[in-house]
Amino acid sequence: MSRRTLSLTLAAVVLLGDRVTKVWIESHLSFSDTIPVIPGVFNIVHTQNRGMAFGLFSNGASASRNLLLAAVALVVLLFVAGLIWRLPPQAPRGQRFTPAALGLILGGALGNLYDRLLKGSVTDFLDLHAGSLHWPAFNIADSAITIGAVLLALELLRPAHRD
């Protein structure tokens, strides 16, 4: 499988997983319902996020915020798609995870952009707690974007191996 095909396949899997889970949440839970999975640690919830990943930029005028966030997502999509298109057939030294990372980011960005364009908000449902600490609810797309960004950062920070 080519590196480009790997990226695009992973993006499609992330997009499909994101859509399936969001549709399930929207059809089985009323807004703000909670299902405790691990009490005090992990819940499944139904929330709508009008901002970015993890609730960032959720304040502000609705129309201008949605336009700005959709534009940012579109720029990210085009940039990542361009990087995928330019992937060399063989992995350059130190770039083993780049196709997977780009696929995760592309799939996650597509998933959240789909919600934002159709509904003006993104469905979030994964809710983590650690004692009194509470992480904002997130979804599969947010997770994929975060994991992809971490993989890219690790590849950039990892020293090149010498033969």
Write out the residue ranges for each language-model feature.
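Alpha-helical transmembrane bundles and membrane-interface segments of multipass inner-membrane proteins
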Residues: 1-163
